[in-house]
Amino acid sequence: MLAPKKQKFRKAHKGRVASKAKAGTTLAFGSFGLKSIDGWRVTARQIEAGRKAATRCMKRQGRLWIRIFPDVPVSKKPAEVRMGKGKGSPEFFAVRVSPGRIMFEIEGVEENVALRALELASAKLPVRTRIVRRYE
């Protein structure tokens, strides 16, 4: 799974996904891409599940790019622990995905295969998405 090698701080604020994405809104590598419509937090496990679903559909042909990286540590308190007594320990990493952000890109497969792969990947993600083409 994706995780940063080094962090400046061990824990992060919860934060919000407020505005539209300023960068990463156009296709840079592939011919087809998966663009987010909502703003939400996507975990490393969800990204990995989407990657596996897409590559399985592509039958390891073509190329898949992941344009997002989980860099925000999400902390959680253990089960059945009372409120207070500090913040919990970091459990997993996530990325805050803004509306309009390209998350996956595909190149080197037929159009129907690419569209099916991106549909399968989007089913694994918590955000609403749309599929974009390079020449649209």
From Swiss-Prot:
Q: Which organism is it from?
A: Rickettsia felis (strain ATCC VR-1525 / URRWXCal2)
**Family label:** Belongs to the universal ribosomal protein uL16 family.
Name assigned to this protein: Large ribosomal subunit protein uL16
Q: What assembly does the database describe for this protein?
A: Part of the 50S ribosomal subunit.
Judging by the UniProt lineage, the source's domain of life is Bacteria
Role description: Binds 23S rRNA and is also seen to make contacts with the A and possibly P site tRNAs.
SUPFAM superfamilies linked to this entry: Ribosomal protein L16p/L10e
* Gene3D superfamilies documented for this protein: Ribosomal protein L10e/L16 (3.90.1170.10)
Print the keywords alphabetically.
Answer: Ribonucleoprotein, Ribosomal protein, RNA-binding, rRNA-binding, tRNA-binding
Would the keyword Glycosyltransferase turn up in this protein's UniProt record?
A: no
| An individual GO BP term | translation
Q: Which InterPro entries match?
A: Ribosomal_uL16, Ribosomal_uL16_bact-type, Ribosomal_uL16_CS, Ribosomal_uL16_dom, Ribosomal_uL16_sf
Pfam families membership: Ribosomal_L16
Q: Name one GO cellular component term.
A: cytosolic large ribosomal subunit
Q: Name one GO molecular function term.
A: tRNA binding
